[in-house]
Design a protein with these regions (language model features):
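Short, well-ordered beta-strand segments in beta-rich or mixed alpha/beta enzyme
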Residues: 29-37, 66-95
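N-terminal targeting signals for Sec/Tat export/insertion, comprising classic cleavable signal peptides
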Residues: 30-60
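An amphipathic, aromatic/His-enriched active-site/gating alpha helix that lines ligand/cofactor pockets
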Residues: 6-7, 25, 52-66, 84-118
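Glycine-rich beta-strand-turn "strand-cap" elements at beta-sheet edges
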Residues: 2-7, 13-31, 68-77, 104-129
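Intrinsically disordered, low-complexity acidic/polar segments
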Residues: 43-45, 78, 90, 125
């Protein structure tokens, strides 16, 4: 499975949310995808840091609707993070949180490359597990 297939799966597997979620016309969520290449020697430490950051963001931030971090099966050092926020203000607020800043400092020397992709929601759906 290549990175694009992983991304498509992540976008369609919005299962962490309790009820169906659909993009609203008046206020669509802000959705982006981060493509991150990690130093393979530091992959374990990176995985721990991203898990801690995502768990804190989901628990503490009402504007964070979904965060999914997945690794490419053929290249585990290639990470994709699907991010969905209530709106751009929620995203900006997320960037200022202590847990996000801690993650950025902790991982700055682990990240070999970072590409942020802006997206346009077409249809976002999920169901309970």
């Amino acid at each position: 499975m290549d990175a694009k297939q992983v991304l498509v799966m992540a976008a369609t597997m919005l299962t962490a949310m309790g009820a169906p979620v659909f993009a609203q016309h008046a206020r669509e969520p802000y959705v982006r995808v981060a493509e991150i290449e990690i130093d393979p020697a530091q992959l374990g430490a990176y995985t721990a840091a991203v898990k801690e950051q995502i768990e804190a963001a989901i628990r503490l931030e009402t504007g964070v609707l979904a965060l999914y971090s997945v690794a490419d099966k053929d290249n585990p050092a290639h990470i994709l993070v699907f991010e969905m926020y209530a709106d751009t203000d929620a995203y900006k607020a997320h960037l200022e949180t202590a847990h996000f800043k801690k993650y950025k400092v902790a991982t700055q020397d682990m990240v070999k490359s970072l590409k942020l992709r802006e997206t346009i929601p077409i249809l976002l759906g999920s169901k309970s597990r």
